[in-house]
Amino acid sequence: MALAMMTVPALSMVSHAETWATFKATYRKTYTVEEEASRFDIFMANLRIIEAENRAQGTEVKGITKFADLTAEEFKARYLMNTPRNKTEALKPWDGKCTACVRFPEQATLLAAPPTAYDWTEHGAVTPVKDQGQCGSCWSFGTTGDVEGVLFLAKHNLTSLSEQQLVSCDEKDLGCDGGLQEDAFKYVKKNGLVTEQQYPYTSGKGKSGRCEEALIQNPVAFVSDWVQISCLGSCEKKAAFDEEGMINALIATGPITIGIDASPMQLYKRGIDNPKNCKTSQAGLDHAVLIVGYGVENGTPYWKIKNSWNTDWGEDGYYRIVRGLNKCGVASDAVHSVA
């Protein structure tokens, strides 16, 4: 039985051993004899979490993902950023200008009355979903996704840029141990980025790798600046974050990279996630992703987010989360590059 289709009723119809065997085959999991029993126990504990959350009949469906054999602590250590996101400088706020209008003039009229839904994947501004592997390099994927979209809207061809260059060569950030998109933007402004084809990703097993200087001599992408889209710092004392302003910025300037508390994403399968217990402060954000769109489904507003855990996770690599409540800090740290 396909794991993607395993809901609570389906799980009750098959033995735990069969479910475990299907999981291992689906995700090509192998363990030592000593490790097998402990991984099975963790898997069973996650099944209980999945069943409990799905019984609540929310707007999301939790299920067996490739991370179902990990504890929450292991998941964070292997796939999220372990370095606190300590900001060292304030960023200038977005000035509200429609910088993307050079490619889509009609976007200027949308700011007065934004549509109920918009998706940049349908307008050519988003490259295919990528895979960071067991490396806390999400910040580099958030950065490249943001720059890819901004340059596309500035009338360049959509080009997949090199995360590996940032992971290995950006000395301000910490490679597989985490980083900040704004520091990465600073690197891109000074050094530029080559394409993914020129400098392919190799850090999937957790090694940042040394900078291959010979591969970064012909950059194809630069940015001129970067801005803060939503409130941060003293703004956190406000009752609400400016998610409506984020909509305007998204439409006007393309996909936006954000920080998020990714703890609820470990067992996410599909639907609009509405986590009850996740962090919203800057210090609690442990993952970087790319907002590519928004919409409303059955009365529930959501953000559509491009993740970097390959297409075998979530909705073909994408994640949807409730919009308007700053869930998991989606509006706590939204930053954006400027072409």
Where are these regions (language model features)?
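Catalytic-core signature of thiol
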Residues: 2-339
